[in-house]
């Protein structure tokens, strides 16, 4: 759980580091990260190092996720960064190669923020007998972002926010990869 005071501290650290961002007009030049959002991904190898209490929370949440899911990981955050999506921005469907678990912590969102989606890459999903479609058996899963929400997922799982353009004035997410 992140308090409102801690959320403000996270926003302050992002604000101090925002000057290093550049608008990536070249997104789409590789298969890893596509879209038109601003990101500290290329500038920050480990953004969480700037916010020790948040790094500790991420470790604790990931440790519990690993315990419940049975993943074998090295107990090390490989890299972390923040993304800022302004109005009409998106992040195309992508994965996080070279890591085991990835996470997205929503810092600033509102009712107009684009949803986070996950895509089930199993082509057989549509050939099984399913009585009821839900988030456990559907090809696409959508999450409405809310501030202070942490979502953990396997790094191989395709995800993004491009199915709907962001209509919020600003959507801020801290992301990380766990090795």
Where are these regions (language model features)?
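Solvent-exposed residues in well-ordered beta-strands and their adjoining turns
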Residues: 2-3, 85, 106-108, 177-179
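Active-site region of the double-stranded beta-helix
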Residues: 43, 48-78, 86-100, 107-111
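A short hydrophobic beta-strand segment most commonly corresponding to one strand
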Residues: 103-105, 168-179
């Amino acid at each position: 759980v992140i308090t409102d005071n801690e959320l403000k501290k996270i926003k302050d650290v992002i604000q101090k580091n925002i000057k290093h961002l550049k608008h990536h007009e070249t997104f789409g030049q590789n298969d890893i990260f596509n879209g038109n959002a601003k990101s500290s991904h290329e500038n920050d190898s480990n953004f969480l190092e700037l916010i020790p209490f948040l790094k500790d929370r991420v470790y604790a949440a990931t440790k519990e996720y690993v315990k419940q899911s049975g993943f074998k990981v090295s107990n090390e955050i490989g890299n972390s960064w923040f993304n800022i999506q302004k109005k009409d921005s998106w992040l195309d469907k992508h994965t996080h190669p070279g890591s085991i678990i990835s996470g997205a912590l929503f810092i600033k969102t509102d009712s107009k923020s684009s949803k986070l989606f996950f895509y089930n890459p199993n082509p057989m999903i549509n050939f099984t007998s399913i009585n009821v479609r839900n988030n456990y058996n559907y090809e696409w899963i959508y999450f409405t972002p809310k501030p202070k929400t942490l979502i953990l997922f396997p790094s191989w799982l395709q995800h993004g926010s491009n199915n709907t353009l962001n209509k919020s004035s600003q959507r801020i997410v801290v992301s990380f990869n766990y090795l």
